[in-house]
């Protein structure tokens, strides 16, 4: 029980459930990779896949559950937030596109994450769209020194730094996702 009397799910922890079975894990097993670009791209890909894995098997209610009151943080909110982060760094900063934010209010990615299947589908569709754009942009960039052109308030930033930032962004939020998922149904690891 929590301090406010809410039931806490039994922790699903053990060596048997700590890691995904290799045949069920879409992430890379590790390098060596063929260079800096491939290393960064694969690490980012694996962090994105980890987010998907942390959300797998949950319905709209589970994805939208704010598991750590009074925070608005939820797994669905993280998906929406990371779609915005992808859009900002790859479409706006790197590609220089003038696009409207997916969620205009500063905290709307989190506060608008409601337990509605249509909201869930829209969030995943938006995230997939932004990830696909980012992957195309990176694949077509001549090298990692390509400079972002879309943020006049910021010094030009090379693609290399954006990729490192995105790995960090996903790693941070995947840590949140670990705790949120454990609070929802006791699932840990993976």
Model-predicted regions and their roles:
Residues 2-23, 27-29, 37-108, 149-190:
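Short, contiguous alpha-helical
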Residues 27-40, 112-118, 122:
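Short, charged, low-complexity loops and linkers
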Residues 109-146, 160-166:
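Acidic/histidine-rich alpha-helical segments that form the ligand environment
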């Amino acid at each position: 029980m929590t301090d406010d009397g809410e039931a806490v799910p039994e922790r699903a922890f053990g060596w048997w459930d700590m890691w995904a079975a290799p045949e069920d894990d879409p992430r890379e097993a590790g390098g060596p990779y063929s260079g800096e670009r491939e290393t960064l791209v694969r690490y980012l890909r694996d962090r994105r896949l980890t987010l998907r894995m942390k959300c797998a098997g949950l319905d709209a209610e589970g994805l939208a559950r704010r598991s750590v009151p009074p925070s608005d943080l939820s797994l669905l909110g993280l998906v929406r937030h990371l779609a915005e982060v992808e859009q900002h760094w790859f479409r706006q900063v790197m590609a220089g596109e003038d696009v409207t934010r997916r969620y205009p209010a500063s905290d709307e990615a989190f506060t608008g994450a409601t337990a509605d299947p249509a909201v869930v589908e829209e969030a995943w569709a938006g995230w997939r769209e932004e990830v696909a754009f980012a992957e195309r942009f990176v694949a077509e960039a001549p090298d990692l020194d390509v400079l972002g052109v879309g943020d006049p308030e910021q010094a030009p930033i090379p693609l290399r730094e954006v990729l490192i930032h995105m790995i960090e962004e996903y790693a941070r939020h995947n840590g949140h996702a670990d705790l949120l998922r454990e609070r929802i149904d006791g699932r840990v690891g993976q």
